[in-house]
A protein has these predicted regions:
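N-terminal beta-strand motif that seeds the catalytic metal site of vicinal oxygen chelate
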Residues: 2-27, 79, 136-142
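Long, continuous compositionally biased terminal/linker segments
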Residues: 3-7, 52-91
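Core segments of cupin and vicinal oxygen chelate
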Residues: 17-60
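Vicinal oxygen chelate
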Residues: 20-25, 81-125
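Exposed loop/turn and edge beta-strand positions of beta-sandwich/beta-sheet ligand-binding modules
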Residues: 45, 75, 116
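Short glycine-/small-residue motifs
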Residues: 60, 131-132
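Short beta->alpha transition motifs characteristic of CBS
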Residues: 114-115, 121, 132-139
Length: 142
C-alpha cells in the first residue's frame, strides 16, 4: 500500500535508541536540538534519556551510554525528525550547529526526495546523521 499522506500512516516504529560516547554532552546536545521541535525529556534512568512530545509515552527517541565494543561512530544511521514548518527546520539546524554538530546539508528545498520536502541535515556529536524536515502541502504535524 502506498500512503498518499505520510502523516496518516500508522506508526510502525515505537522508539529509536542510539549509543553515545559522551553521555552528558550528548544529553545537552539533544536537549537543545529537540526542544526546537517541541520535544522534551520524558523519561530518564541511569545511562539513558528519552525525548518525545508531551502527550506521547513511551518517549520516541532515546540515547544511551555506549558500552565497550559498540560501534564508535555514525555507522550510517539516519534519523529524520518531523518539523511543523520551515522555521522549526531552521531552528533545529542552528541549535545543532551551535551545540557542536557538523553541517551535512543546510535548510532547503529538496525536490529529489518528494514534492514539498524542506529539510536540513547534520551529523551529531557521534557522527549520526539527523535531519529535520517538513513536507509542505500536507497537513501540519500536531
Amino acid at each position: 500500500m502506498v500512503w498518499s499522506d505520510p502523516l496518516a500512516m500508522p506508526a510502525f516504529v515505537d522508539h529509536v535508541s542510539i549509543p553515545v560516547a559522551d553521555f552528558e554532552r550528548s544529553a545537552a546536545f539533544y536537549d537543545a536540538v529537540l526542544a526546537t521541535l517541541g520535544l522534551r525529556r520524558r523519561k530518564q534512568r541511569e545511562g539513558a534519556i528519552g525525548w518525545g512530545p508531551d502527550d506521547v509515552l513511551p518517549p520516541i527517541f532515546w540515547i544511551h551510554a555506549r558500552e565497550p565494543g559498540h560501534a564508535t561512530s555514525g555507522i550510517g544511521l539516519h534519523i529524520g525528525f518531523r518539523a511543523k514548518d520551515r522555521t522549526e527546520v531552521h531552528a533545529f539546524h542552528e541549535a545543532a550547529l551551535r551545540m557542536g554538530a557538523t553541517d551535512a546539508g543546510a535548510p532547503g528545498v529538496r525536490p529529489q526526495y518528494t514534492a514539498g520536502f524542506y529539510g536540513c541535515f547534520v551529523l551529531d556529536l557521534d557522527g549520526f546523521k539527523i535531519e529535520a524536515l517538513v513536507r509542505e502541502g500536507l497537513p501540519p504535524r500536531d
